[in-house]
């Protein structure tokens, strides 16, 4: 889940763990879909990391015999990564403020995300 933009503002942040993420965005289990965010370059890029467990609640019904992470949740994980990048690098950002996508163009899912996968 790499988020990219065009300009660079300030210094990079190497990694934010789950506790630091929770201080920045309001999402909580079961909808908090990133475990950490790495390589945050302000206004430019960030990499969200999610270790997908067999215990994820959405696997119960999607699909019981062939569990696959729903694409809409992958997009949500990308949005959460972007929110963390904005929150962590914007001066005077109010923690817990919601950040929204306005458009997503040409999104493609190259392969199913299954239990045991780690997505970036």
Regions found by a protein language model. Give the residues of each.
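Active-site helix/loop of acyl-thioester processing domains in fatty-acid/polyketide metabolism
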Residues: 37, 69-93
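Short aromatic-glycine motifs in intrinsically disordered, low-complexity regions
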Residues: 16-28, 95-96
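Iron-sulfur (Fe-S) cluster-binding modules
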Residues: 1-2
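Catalytic strand-loop segment that frames the active site of acyl-thioester-processing enzymes
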Residues: 28-69
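Hydrophobic beta-strand-centered segment that forms part of the acyl-chain substrate-binding groove
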Residues: 6, 10-15, 82-120
């Amino acid at each position: 889940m790499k988020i990219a933009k065009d300009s660079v503002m300030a210094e990079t942040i190497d990694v934010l763990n789950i506790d630091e993420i929770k201080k920045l965005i309001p999402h909580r289990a079961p909808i908090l879909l990133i475990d950490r965010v790495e390589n945050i370059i302000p206004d430019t890029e960030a990499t969200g990391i999610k270790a997908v467990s067999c215990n994820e609640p959405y696997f119960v019904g999607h699909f019981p015999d062939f569990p696959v992470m729903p694409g809409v949740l992958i997009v949500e994980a990308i949005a959460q990564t972007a929110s963390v990048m904005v929150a962590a690098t914007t001066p005077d950002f109010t923690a817990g403020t919601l950040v929204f996508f306005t458009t997503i163009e040409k999104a493609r899912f190259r392969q199913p995300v299954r239990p045991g996968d780690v997505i970036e």
